[in-house]
Swiss-Prot record:
It is found in: Lipid droplet; Membrane. This is Bypass of stop codon protein 2. The modification Phosphoserine is found at S177. The chain crosses the membrane at residues 68-88. Keywords: Lipid droplet, Membrane, Phosphoprotein, Transmembrane, Transmembrane helix. Its main location: other. It comes from the Eukaryota. GO terms for cellular component: lipid droplet; membrane. Present with 922 molecules/cell in log phase SD medium. GO terms for biological process: lipid catabolic process. It is a single-pass membrane protein.
Length: 235
């Protein structure tokens, strides 16, 4: 870049020296030589400006590339910072799922070992309830249901008297009220004789029955016993 100005000064000084030595020379040759030197000087100026502008362009290009690299790096860091919590949460969830899977595998292995038959007549301390025990518990629940239903029917029908002549049922003095009750007959042959099946009330409100407290107590006791039996079955 500094070579062209020095060359231009050297050419100009030689031309001036030549003009002073040959002052009596031909003017056409001198004018042509001067014109050539001026053209060369302008060419050098253009080359210098071109190289200068190319250098500026290269510097601008390198600066823009540096700025673009910094911007790209900042964008990458921003994306990493934004995605880092999600990545950490996914890693924690994956770790918890793996721990849960290992826990389930250990439980399954322990269950399979406990369900295997034990030799030398040793009883198992843990394991599922056998089918025989389940059947026994089911029978207990069924018997409890039958007993509670029979006691409930006996309390609800307590105090009802059947009048043979009128074919209706009246309440006794314990209920302190009388109401018409339809007596439904079902003919069943039991030991070659007819028996009457059940009563059905029509005009009586269930809540006005004095035996309602007894019935509710029976239901509560039945519910509690049924829950206890179900807990024993599930244990």
């Amino acid at each position: 870049m500094f070579f062209f100005p020095k060359l231009r000064k050297l050419i100009g000084s030689t031309v001036i020296d030549h003009d002073t030595k040959n002052s009596s020379g031909k003017e056409e040759i001198m004018s042509n030589s001067r014109l050539a030197l001026v053209i060369i000087n302008h060419a050098f100026d253009k080359v210098l400006s071109l190289t200068w502008h190319c250098g500026i362009l290269s510097e601008i290009r390198s600066g823009l590339m540096l700025m673009f690299g910094i911007f790209q790096l900042m964008c990458s860091l921003g994306v990493i910072v934004l995605l880092l919590p999600i990545i950490i949460l996914d890693a924690i969830d994956l770790f918890l799922y793996m721990c849960r899977l290992l826990d389930y595998g250990c439980k399954l292995f322990h269950y399979n070992r406990s369900s295997l038959p034990v030799a030398d007549g040793k009883e198992k301390t843990s394991g599922p309830i056998s089918g025989k025990e389940e059947i026994v518990i089911d029978e207990e629940i069924i018997n409890m249901l039958n007993e509670s239903s029979e006691s409930l029917i006996n309390h609800t029908t307590a105090g009802l008297e059947y009048d043979i002549s009128s074919g209706s049922v009246n309440k006794s003095r314990r209920l302190n009220s009388t109401s018409t009750v339809t007596f439904v007959k079902q003919n069943k042959l039991v030991n070659e004789r007819r028996e009457d099946a059940y009563y059905e009330e029509e005009d009586d409100d269930f809540l006005s029955n004095p035996n309602y407290d007894k019935i509710s107590l029976i239901e509560k006791s039945f519910t509690s016993r049924f829950e206890v039996a179900c807990e024993q079955k599930a244990a």
